[in-house]
Amino acid sequence: MLSPKRTKFRKYHRGRLTGKIYLIDKVVFGNYALQSLEPGWITSRQIEAARRVITRYAKRGGKLWIRIFPDKPVTFRAAETRMGSRKGNVEYWVAIVKPGKILYEVLGISESIAKYSLKIAGYKMPIKTRVIVKI
């Protein structure tokens, strides 16, 4: 699973999911991309599951770019613990995604396979997504 090697602080506040991408996020590396349509947290496991789907359909031919990285730790306190007494342990890492963010890009595979694999990868995400084509 993806996680940062080191961070400035071990634990962070949860924060709020407000706003959108102000600079329009474009397809930079590949020809086809998966774009988010709503805000959310995407865990490192979900990123890995979608990566596996895309690489399985691309076989040996294509190249894949993952444009998000899980750099926010999510903590949980143990069950039946009293209030107070510090923050819980880091359980997993998430990437903060806003509407319009490019999640994955592919290059070097046919249009039908690229669109289909990105569509299936979108089903692995906890947010609505769409497949876009580089103009």
Swiss-Prot record:
Keyword DNA damage: no
InterPro entries the record matches: Ribosomal_uL16, Ribosomal_uL16_bact-type, Ribosomal_uL16_CS, Ribosomal_uL16_dom, Ribosomal_uL16_sf
Entries under PROSITE patterns matching the protein: RIBOSOMAL_L16_1 (PS00586), RIBOSOMAL_L16_2 (PS00701)
Places the protein is found: Plastid, Chloroplast
GO molecular function: rRNA binding; structural constituent of ribosome
Keywords of the record: Chloroplast, Plastid, Ribonucleoprotein, Ribosomal protein
Gene Ontology biological process terms from the UniProt entry: mitochondrial translation
GO CC field: chloroplast; mitochondrial large ribosomal subunit
One Pfam family per UniProt: Ribosomal_L16
Protein's UniProt keywords contain Amino-acid biosynthesis: no
UniProt xrefs under NCBIfam families: rplP_bact (TIGR01164)
Family of the protein in this entry: Belongs to the universal ribosomal protein uL16 family.
Subunit structure: Part of the 50S ribosomal subunit.
Name this polypeptide is given: Large ribosomal subunit protein uL16c
Source organism per UniProt: Euglena gracilis
Gene responsible for this protein: rpl16
